[in-house]
């Protein structure tokens, strides 16, 4: 194993760990502040990602797709909170888990129905595709 490969794998693990930390911090924050177990907040992450890929495929603009990603995830999150999640605030935690797990299944199937079962790709601008010290780890993953 070369030193470059070792550093690449270390950076991949660090990036993946940060992503897991952010998602688990969101779950902990929602439960700690609101007393609500919302397992479906990762589905909003997925909706944002698919809306970004679809916007990029249509307009071919990374920055517009980034804006669409945040906007779409925020709008869907607000609608879900006002229509479904608010009714769960005074309910038992088991009810919260069941409903939010049902939301995961619903959003997963909705995305599969709209976009299909194949992955979508997004070209990243060269600004975020720089290499670090002769290592092929993209800057966007470190950021």
Stretches found by the model and what they are:
Residues 6-55, 83-95:
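Single transmembrane alpha-helix segments in multi-pass membrane proteins
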Residues 98, 105-132:
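Extracellular/periplasmic helix-loop junction at the C-terminal end of a transmembrane helix
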């Amino acid at each position: 194993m070369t030193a470059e490969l070792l550093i690449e794998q270390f950076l991949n693990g660090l990036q993946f760990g940060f992503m897991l930390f952010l998602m688990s911090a969101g779950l902990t924050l929602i439960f700690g502040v609101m007393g609500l177990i919302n397992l479906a907040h990762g589905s909003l992450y997925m909706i944002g990602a698919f809306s970004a890929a679809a916007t990029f495929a249509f307009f071919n603009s990374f920055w517009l797709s980034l804006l669409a990603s945040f906007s779409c995830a925020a709008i869907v999150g607000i609608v879900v909170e006002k229509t479904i999640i608010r009714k769960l605030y005074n309910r038992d935690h088991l009810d919260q888990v069941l409903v939010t797990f049902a939301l995961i299944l619903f959003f997963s199937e909705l995305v599969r129905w709209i976009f299909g079962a194949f992955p979508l790709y997004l070209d990243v601008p060269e600004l975020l595709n720089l290499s670090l010290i002769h290592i092929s780890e993209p800057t966007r993953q470190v950021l």
